[in-house]
């Protein structure tokens, strides 16, 4: 089913990897392949064995971190998540995706048997995602398991599918040219102009889609999902670390290339409530200043700080200098 940490270390030692090499690759493997727990009473997580072995095979052959952290053959199996989620309709599907991508636990009574041909309800779908390793046990609530995404690789898969649904509902497809323009502007100039233009398209196209109960707070999630596809960045968020933290932080993986870092704090107002805009911007500025003093943030070079206030169909951006 998977490797414990000790079993993984045995595999690493069998490949005659030095202590220095192990210290380099274990944190990457932990972030991307660890996190699985299939018993509410279990005390330790396990690593995905298939993905771990793929990573090690690539590393042992090249002595470099693989550029792709998921084998294409394994990734094709993960595309099945879309087919499963499509069995659940409308807002329920989007809400499950929102919770999972944001890191919010899903409390569910895992069923032992289900028959999609007869009936396939929300709890059945959550149970199936659990059995197939798309969700895992992260805690307990009143005797029932709390389920979350186990690791970064799985989060990227969910984020991709979330954007597929959003693109379909918005009748808008972000092409590769626009994606590259957004990335180039962020990385080279530290600006968000093209990203915000794209967010406005989603906001305007989705605001009238009552069938999915679109909320302006989805804009932050769309920003996060788009950022997850920027492979030159580490993406951290309040959703991810589950504590008092900036909403979204983009830090270049390779700081020697001079790419800009980005820090964003989001706030929201009801449509027509722009009289409170300055108050919301001030609140966001104060949070940005406070978070900037965190040890892991204050030493980040080339950090560009922004507040974004979403009010109805409008987006107000302020750069903090």
Where are these regions (language model features)?
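Amphipathic alpha-helical segments of the small helical/lid subdomains adjacent to P-loop NTPase cores
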Residues: 1-57, 96
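Noncatalytic linker/hinge segments flanking ATPase motor cores
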Residues: 8-20, 178, 189, 304-310
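Secondary-structure transition/hinge residues
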Residues: 16, 231, 296-299
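Acidic carboxylate-rich catalytic motifs and surrounding loops in phosphoryl-/glycosyl-chemistry enzymes
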Residues: 27-39, 140-141, 239, 306-308
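Intrinsically disordered, low-complexity boundary segments flanking structured domains
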Residues: 39-40, 251, 293-296
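Domain-level recognition of nuclease-like catalytic cores that cleave nucleotide substrates
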Residues: 296-321
């Amino acid at each position: 089913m998977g490797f414990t940490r000790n079993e993984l270390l045995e595999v690493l030692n069998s490949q005659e990897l030095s202590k220095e090499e192990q210290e380099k690759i274990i944190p990457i493997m932990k972030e991307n392949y660890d996190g699985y727990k299939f018993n509410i009473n279990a005390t330790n997580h396990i690593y995905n064995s298939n993905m771990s072995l793929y990573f090690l095979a690539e590393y042992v052959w090249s002595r470099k971190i693989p550029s792709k952290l998921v084998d294409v053959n394994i990734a094709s199996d993960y595309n099945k998540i879309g087919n499963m989620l499509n069995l659940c309709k409308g807002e329920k599907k989007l809400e499950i995706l929102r919770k999972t991508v944001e890191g919010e636990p899903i409390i569910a009574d895992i069923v032992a048997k289900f028959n999609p041909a007869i009936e396939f309800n929300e709890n059945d779908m959550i149970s199936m995602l659990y059995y197939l390793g798309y969700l895992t046990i992260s805690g307990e609530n009143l005797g029932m398991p709390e389920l979350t995404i186990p690791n970064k690789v799985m989060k990227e898969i969910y984020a991709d599918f979330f954007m597929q649904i959003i693109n379909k509902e918005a009748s808008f497809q972000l092409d590769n040219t626009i994606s590259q323009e957004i990335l180039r502007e962020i990385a080279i100039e530290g600006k968000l102009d093209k990203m915000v233009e794209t967010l406005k398209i989603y906001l305007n196209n989705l605001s009238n889609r009552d069938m999915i109960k679109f909320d302006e707070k989805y804009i932050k999630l769309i920003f996060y999902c788009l950022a997850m596809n920027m492979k030159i960045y580490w993406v951290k968020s309040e959703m991810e670390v589950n504590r008092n933290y900036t909403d979204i932080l983009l830090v270049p993986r390779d700081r020697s290339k001079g790419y800009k870092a980005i820090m964003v704090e989001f706030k929201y107002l009801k449509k027509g409530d722009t009289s409170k805009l300055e108050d919301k911007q001030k609140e966001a500025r104060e949070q940005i200043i406070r978070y900037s003093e965190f040890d892991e943030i204050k030493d980040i070079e080339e950090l560009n700080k922004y507040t974004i206030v979403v009010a109805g169909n409008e987006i107000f951006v302020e750069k903090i200098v």
